[in-house]
C-alpha cells in the first residue's frame, strides 16, 4: 500500500476551481447563458494533468507518461470508450423523429386528466431507451409546453415531470453514459447493476407518479395534445430496451438497434443512405468529448494513485464513515460532491470511479452495489442542481417557445430526485450485506 499523501489530490482541486469557479463567474456574475457549459472541460482536465506532472520530482517525466499510459490499459476503460461510441451511433441512426413517435403515441392513448403523469412515464421510457436525460428533456419539453397550454396544467409541473422521468431513465438505461461509466469503472455486468438500481428507482418513480396524479386531480383541465406518430419508428427503442433488460451483451443490443433503425429509416424514406452514414458519424462525434474526458481522468487518476492521493482520501473517509452502510453513504456523497462541482454526472462518476472502487473493496461492498450507488447519487444531485445541463436545457427549450420559467419555479416540483434520495437511504438501511460478494472476498 502506498504512503498517504494529501498533496497528491491538488490536481483535483485545480480542476474544481477552474471548472466550478469559472462556471459560477460566467453563469451568475457575467450572466452568460449556460455559463457552466461554456467552460471547455477537456482544457480544465489538461491543466489539472499538467499540475499533476509538476508534482513529485522524484519521478521523471517519462515515468509519469508511462504511469498515465498504464492507467489507460485497463480493459474497462477501452470497453467504456467503445460503448460510448456505439451508443452515439445508435442515437444518430434513429434520430429525434423516432423518440417523438414514442412520446406522441403514449400521449394519444391516455385521457387528458392524466397527461402530466403520462409526460413523466413517457420521459421514463424515452430516456431509458435513448440513454440520455438531456436528449429526452430537449425532445419532450416542447411537448410539455403544449400539454400545459392545451390542458391548463401548471407549466413548472409539466417541465419538472419530464425532468424527473428523464433522470429515471438516465439512471437505469443500458446505453446511458452514466451506466456505462459506473459499470465498467466498478467491474460489474450492466444487468446486475440494473437489478440493483431497479428496486431503488422503481418505488421512487411510483410514489412520484402518485404525487403527480394527486396534483393533477386538483387542477382544472382543458383539451389534450394530438399529433401524428409512426409506430414502426418505435421498434428500435423497444428492441434495445428488451435486449438490455434481458441481459443480452450491450454491444449486441446496440448493433441490433443500429441495424433495425437503419433498415426502418431507409425503408420509410426518413433518410437517404448517404445521410444515414452522416448521422452515424454525427452520433459518434457527440460522444467524443465524453470519451476524451474518460481518457484524461484515467490518466490523471493514475498519477494521483501513484502519489498516494487515494490513500489519503480513503483514510479521511474512513474516519467519518464506519461499516458497510457508512461506506455506501461515503460513496454516495463522494460522487454527489463531484457532481455539484462539475455539474456533469458522467464526469462525476468517471472521477469518483477509482476511489469508489477502492472504498468498495475496503468496505466489502459488491461491484453491482457500488456501481448502483455511483449512478443513483449522481442522478439525485444532477437532477436538482439549478446549474445542471438538464435544468438549463429545459429552461432554454421553454424560452425558445416564447414562455418564461426559472429553475426555482421548477425545483419545488422535482419530486423524483428527492424521493430517489429517500428510497436510496431507506434501501441502504434495510438491506443486508451481499453474502455472495463476501464469500468471494474470503
Question: What do the PLM-derived regions correspond to, one by one?
Answer:
Residues 83, 113-126, 152-169, 326-339, ...:
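Alpha-helical transmembrane segments of multi-pass membrane proteins
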Residues 74-80, 104-122, 148-158, 227-235, ...:
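Membrane-interfacial loop-to-helix junctions in multi-pass transporters
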Residues 38-46, 50-55, 64-98, 113, ...:
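Core transmembrane alpha-helical segments of multi-pass membrane transporters/permeases
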Residues 164-167, 171-227, 232, 383-384, ...:
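Juxtamembrane and boundary regions of transmembrane helices in multi-pass small-molecule transporters
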Residues 7-21, 35-57, 78-86, 232-243, ...:
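Hydrophobic mid-bilayer segments of alpha-helices in multi-pass membrane transport proteins
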Residues 80-91, 111-143, 318-357, 362-363, ...:
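Hydrophobic alpha-helical transmembrane segments of multi-pass integral membrane proteins
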Amino acid at each position: 500500500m502506498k504512503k498517504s499523501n494529501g498533496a497528491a489530490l491538488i490536481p483535483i482541486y485545480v480542476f474544481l476551481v477552474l471548472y466550478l469557479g469559472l462556471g459560477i463567474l460566467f453563469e451568475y456574475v457575467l450572466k452568460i447563458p449556460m455559463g457552466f457549459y461554456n467552460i471547455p472541460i477537456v482544457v480544465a482536465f489538461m491543466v489539472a494533468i499538467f499540475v499533476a506532472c509538476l508534482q513529485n520530482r522524484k519521478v521523471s517525466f517519462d515515468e509519469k507518461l508511462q504511469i498515465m499510459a498504464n492507467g489507460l490499459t485497463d480493459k474497462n476503460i477501452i470497453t467504456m470508450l467503445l460503448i460510448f461510441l456505439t451508443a452515439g451511433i445508435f442515437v444518430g441512426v434513429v434520430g429525434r423523429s423516432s423518440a417523438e413517435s414514442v412520446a406522441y403515441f403514449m400521449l394519444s392513448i391516455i385521457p387528458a386528466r392524466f397527461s402530466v403523469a403520462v409526460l413523466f412515464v413517457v420521459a421514463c421510457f424515452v430516456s431509458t431507451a435513448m440513454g440520455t436525460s438531456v436528449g429526452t428533456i430537449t425532445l419532450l419539453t416542447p411537448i410539455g409546453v403544449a400539454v400545459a397550454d392545451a390542458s391548463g396544467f401548471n407549466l413548472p409541473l409539466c417541465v419538472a415531470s419530464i425532468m424527473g422521468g428523464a433522470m429515471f431513465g438516465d439512471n437505469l438505461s443500458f446505453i446511458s453514459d452514466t451506466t456505462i461509466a459506473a459499470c465498467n469503472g466498478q467491474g460489474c455486468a450492466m444487468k446486475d447493476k440494473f437489478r440493483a438500481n431497479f428496486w431503488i428507482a422503481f418505488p421512487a418513480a411510483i410514489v412520484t407518479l402518485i404525487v403527480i396524479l394527486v396534483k393533477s386531480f386538483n387542477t382544472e383541465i382543458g383539451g389534450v395534445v394530438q399529433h401524428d406518430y409512426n409506430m414502426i419508428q418505435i421498434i428500435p427503442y423497444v428492441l434495445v430496451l428488451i435486449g438490455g433488460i434481458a441481459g443480452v451483451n450491450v454491444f449486441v443490443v446496440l448493433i441490433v438497434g443500429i441495424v433495425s433503425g437503419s433498415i426502418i429509416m431507409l425503408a420509410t424514406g426518413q433518410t437517404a443512405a448517404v445521410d444515414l452514414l452522416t448521422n452515424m458519424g454525427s452520433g459518434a462525434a457527440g460522444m467524443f468529448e465524453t470519451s476524451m474526458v474518460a481518457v484524461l481522468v484515467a490518466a490523471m487518476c493514475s498519477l494521483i494513485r501513484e502519489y498516494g492521493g487515494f490513500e489519503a482520501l480513503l483514510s479521511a473517509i474512513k474516519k467519518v464513515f464506519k461499516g458497510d452502510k457508512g461506506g455506501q453513504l461515503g460513496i454516495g456523497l463522494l460522487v454527489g460532491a463531484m457532481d455539484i462541482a462539475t455539474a456533469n454526472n458522467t464526469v462525476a462518476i468517471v472521477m469518483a470511479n477509482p476511489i469508489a472502487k477502492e472504498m468498495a473493496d475496503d468496505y466489502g461492498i459488491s461491484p453491482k452495489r457500488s456501481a448502483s450507488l455511483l449512478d443513483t447519487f449522481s442522478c439525485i444531485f444532477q437532477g436538482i442542481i439549478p446549474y445542471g445541463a438538464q435544468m438549463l436545457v429545459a429552461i432554454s427549450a421553454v424560452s425558445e417557445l416564447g414562455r418564461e420559467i426559472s429553475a426555482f419555479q421548477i425545483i419545488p416540483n422535482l419530486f423524483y430526485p428527492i424521493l430517489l434520495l429517500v428510497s436510496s437511504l431507506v434501501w441502504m438501511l434495510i438491506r443486508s450485506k451481499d453474502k455472495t460478494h463476501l464469500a468471494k472476498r474470503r
